[in-house]
């Protein structure tokens, strides 16, 4: 199993939107590295749902329920989507400022590649964030 972090701007797709839909098509990704990460996602991989821009924070978990397919928002077959199911809303949001301050999270792609919308997360970082979010 692999772990990922997916970013969303609340104006585009909020946690409330995800909660209502339960299963989301993750589309509109137009960065090659992020697209390659979508391609690498496997069934049942787990993603941290991260709210970007306003009060950026890790706020929920979701899992991959459909592996990559052509993004339905474009005719260009180079761009991909996956389907994600919301599985858990964190008890405590983990804000970017807290992640930046945590010594064991300093190597997260979130801090090094801040604009990347789909990024891998190590099992260690995933465990730290989930334990923290649910404590």
Would you name each region that the model predicts?
Residues 1-43, 125, 133-135:
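Compositionally biased, charged N-terminal/linker segments
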Residues 5-7, 49-50, 61:
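Short, conserved beta-strand edge motifs with alternating hydrophobic and charged residues
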Residues 17, 41-42, 57, 75-77:
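Short glycine/proline-enriched turns and hinge-like loops at secondary-structure junctions
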Residues 50-56:
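Short, charged beta-turn/beta-strand-edge "cap" motif at the junction between a beta-strand
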Residues 59-119:
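Aromatic- and Lys/Arg-enriched surface recognition patch
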């Amino acid at each position: 199993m692999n772990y990922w972090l997916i970013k969303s701007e609340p104006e585009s797709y909020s946690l409330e939107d995800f909660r209502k839909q339960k299963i989301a098509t993750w589309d509109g990704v137009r960065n090659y590295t992020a697209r390659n990460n979508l391609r690498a996602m496997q069934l049942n991989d787990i993603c941290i749902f991260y709210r970007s821009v306003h009060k950026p924070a890790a706020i929920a978990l979701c899992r991959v329920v459909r592996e990559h397919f052509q993004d339905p928002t474009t005719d260009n077959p180079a761009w991909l989507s996956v389907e994600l199911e919301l599985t858990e809303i964190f008890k405590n949001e983990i804000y970017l400022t807290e992640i930046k301050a945590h010594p064991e999270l300093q190597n997260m792609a979130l801090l090094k590649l801040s604009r990347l919308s789909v990024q891998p997360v190590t099992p260690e970082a995933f465990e730290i964030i989930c334990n923290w979010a649910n404590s």
